[in-house]
């Protein structure tokens, strides 16, 4: 049935959007954490190893000062942008969209094997989960660029033609593709 294939296609692409966001946020969060630990550790280790009279200690303090400014800037950016909340939202979306995608694949395999009433119950459950997750994902401000990315990922994975350019993507990268459905991201 077409609606099951559609849910599978969309859920896969949506999980790719939020996985991509999650990886970007993960790197940023690691930088903030690294700088927060590195600065005091660098000064502490230098003083413990070489004492307060070490000739290079002023250079270490200067480097630590610059690193502290960077760390404070990243920390402030993280707080204002809500990186931790966004990371959690992305992780929840990836997990749930992947579960919906897997469920859709399972339901699709049962088409023709189950009687129509049981199949309808499975499809209704799948549709309800998909629509609820879709509403939650809409609050996460998905851009047109991300939608094109998701469409390309799904078209490539499912070996389907893009709905605009009617081409099956051969790679995950858009390259010179100028299609408004699967390129320009």
What are these regions (language model features)?
Residues 1-38, 73-172:
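Conserved non-transmembrane functional hotspots
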């Amino acid at each position: 049935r077409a609606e099951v294939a559609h849910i599978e296609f969309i859920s896969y692409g949506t999980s790719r959007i939020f996985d991509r966001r999650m990886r970007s946020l993960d790197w940023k969060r690691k930088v903030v954490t690294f700088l927060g630990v590195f600065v005091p550790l660098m000064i502490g280790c230098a003083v413990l190893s070489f004492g307060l009279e070490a000739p290079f200690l002023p250079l270490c303090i200067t480097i630590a000062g610059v690193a502290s400014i960077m760390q404070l800037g990243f920390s402030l950016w993280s707080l204002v942008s809500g990186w931790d909340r966004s990371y959690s939202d992305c992780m929840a979306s990836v997990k749930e969209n992947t579960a919906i995608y897997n469920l859709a694949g399972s339901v699709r395999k049962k088409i023709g094997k189950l009687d129509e009433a049981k199949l309808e119950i499975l499809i209704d459950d799948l549709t309800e989960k998909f629509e609820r997750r879709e509403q939650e994902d809409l609050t996460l401000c998905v851009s047109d660029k991300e939608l094109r990315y998701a469409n390309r990922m799904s078209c490539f994975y499912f070996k389907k033609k893009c709905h605009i350019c009617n081409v099956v993507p051969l790679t995950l990268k858009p390259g010179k593709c100028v299609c408004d459905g699967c390129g320009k991201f």
